[in-house]
Amino acid sequence: KNSNTENFQPIPLDSIKIKMKIGTKNHSLEFGISNNLFKKLKGISEKSSKFLLSKNNSIRETSKNILIIEFNPIKYQSFFERMPDSNLNFLMYNRRRPAIWNLQSYDLIKKSGCLIQTKNSLSDSNLSKIISNGKSQFEAKISDLFSKESFFESFFSIEGISFWPTFKEYFQEYFKKRAFEFIEEVELTKKLMKKYDFSSILILSEVGPNERIILQLAQEEQIPVCLVQHGINYDTKESYGMNVAKGVLPIESDHFLCWGKTGEEFSRSMSINPEKIHSIGSPIFDRLTFDEQNSLKNDCVLLVTSGPTKEHALDLTIEIIEKYMNAITKVCQLVTKYNKKLIIKTHPSPDELDPSFIAKQINSQIKVIKEGNISPLIQSCDLMIVIGFTSPIVDAHVLKKPVISLTALDNDWGIPTALKNESCLITDIDGLEDNLNSVLNNEHIKNELIQNGIKSSNEYLSHQSNGAAKLIGFLEELVK
């Protein structure tokens, strides 16, 4: 093989897809950059942010410190807006996402008084030496590990035929690179924990690499960790393994701050300690209110997609992908037939299938939006159609919009509450036309869906419009 070619082989998770909104008409551009370039750009922005947020570089010595991990300040806007009124100090540590990336996020953090911790703010010559020594020690262990050639040849084999030699060098390079990255992350987090005395820590998932590090160090220091529910979850017995794999259940966290009664009851049914579970609502819905004036502009159908994922093996089959594409095609055809405008809002995941090529073949006027807040789109639509089980269902119910759930993806996770409490009209592709016609032209059916949706949102979401206050109130009580 050509060694120059081998050097350019991509390593998993070594590149990042970035979606960027262009202009004011929701046009978006997607491009990929290497992980190394992303880290360099993130480092530059963090150094600039430190200068621009000089007033945020001090904390009140008499107040308790709360560490928040990988939070999006725009999504949690009401939470950040309430921080100045609290008697707590908030510090944010984002290693995968930038804390600041536009004027809105900068303004929110500046006004919140939240202290941003970065690699730059934690690094010094002593830490660099510790990391370097750790890598040297681990490199020797890696060499010893991979010297056991017979084990790897046997492990990576099928019916006695080993395929270890075909990817040996690639695997070793990948393993070493990731190990060195984790050594750095562990030491940075240790430095952060020594630098500040934290009374509690907020995380959004238990499975992220930095969250795993935080959970272990927090347990050693006996610092309570709160897992904050950040999206709608399957609440079925069949989905337990999937939910654990996604890190959305409090397996290791000390507290679970769930949205409402539905999440609370599901957690109890999964034998999670009731003392861990706290129904406090969610700051991400605080600014979501029904606007009757704008709601009268109902001039479109909104299709919300949550397509096949790389994490679920069944989603990778040709059959499932074709079924998903056929569902989008059918929606585009029917909405065009009824002379309604159609907007497609995709899931924000970088790996989400872009349906633009499908939509434009049917109707060039169909808009596909990949970035931005979905609430204004829901507010101005006459009807929302969802493919998959996704959080905008709750948004639509709060905003009093009828929802059709189009079954296009097969899984073994059971049927969640929102898809069996009559708050959504459930249909397959064959029944979509009749159901779409019913909701668009039958006010009784439409209003019944809206009323059932309101009831469902009250079960899913407690303390509506007051989630941030409840979250901060819980933290103040926890650490006092």
Question: Which residues are covered by each model-predicted region?
Answer:
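Catalytic-core helical/loop segments in enzymes performing group transfer/polymerization on anionic/lipid-linked
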Residues: 1-480
